[in-house]
Amino acid sequence: MPDDGTGSQEHVDWSPWLGQPLTAGVLTDYDGTLALVVEDRDQAVPLPGARDVISALADRFAVVAVVSGRPVGYLESQLGRIPRVTLVGLYGLERIENGELRVMNTAAQWDEIVVSAATSVAQAAPPGLEIEMKGMTLVLHSRRAPETLQWARQWAAERARSTGLVAQHGRSSVELLPPVHFDKGTVVEELSAGLSSVCFFGDDVGDLPAFRVLRRLRSEGKTTIAVGVESPEQPDELANAVDLLVRGPEQALALLSSLADGTWPYPFDG
């Protein structure tokens, strides 16, 4: 990350990706990066051409992955199984890699507790609060009813204390997850093993751990670039956590497309 915290593109050097693609990785979030953020999450779809760009990236780079808080089955339904592309869902709890589904076994034992929490909140939630079961996690969305966010966070905190689940806050949501150490940062660290350079594209609170890991990996000698994507759910910390801030998913996809084509993406109008 740039020392001045500005996210200025003047600090960004893509030459390792262009000159040494076989030791480089390209990792990206899904919502707000490959797809527009929409009020109804069920209506979010990849931008036109996104799947082709991801496929082209996989033809060029050593590691390409889509890393999301969504269930991996959802990612597969939107993007398909693209050869040599790893789909990581639920912040790392599950993934599709080399055509095979893998689930973190240590989290599976929490299934019944999460289901019980979903049943409980469905009976108590105020009108307008959206309840989403995401496999082994439970999310309460207040995007359509912002006045319910405080209630959701308080309920989640109490449920976390009584069950051992972990409450994780988003800008307009709160998520209950199994108490297993995983996030987008742990995913980035795992996927970057053996690479000389790695970049990550993200827009939300859940992407901040990935950017923090990139900062540490850089201090250890790896070349890293953190790309922030402006979105309605952009956290205040995003601008100071990234090297480059692009204007929405369309510009993020254009940058990814440049990398896939092996063309120089700088200066990029960020």
Provide a role label for each language-model segment.
Residues 2-9, 21, 47, 185-270:
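Mg2+-dependent phosphoryl-transfer enzymes with acidic/Ser/Thr/Gly-rich catalytic loops
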Residues 1-30, 34-42, 49, 59, ...:
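Non-catalytic pre-domain segments flanking phosphatase-related domains
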Residues 45-133:
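Active-site phosphate-binding/coordination module
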Residues 34-44, 171-179:
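Glycine-rich phosphate-binding "P-loop"
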Residues 128, 132-214, 219-223:
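Conserved acidic, metal-coordinating active-site core of Asp-based
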Residues 84-91, 150, 219-226:
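Short hydrophobic/aromatic-enriched beta-strand-loop microsegments
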Residues 63-65, 86, 139, 199, ...:
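A structural signal for isolated positions on well-ordered beta-strands in alpha/beta enzyme cores
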Residues 33, 72, 206:
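Conserved Rossmann-like nucleotide-cofactor binding loop
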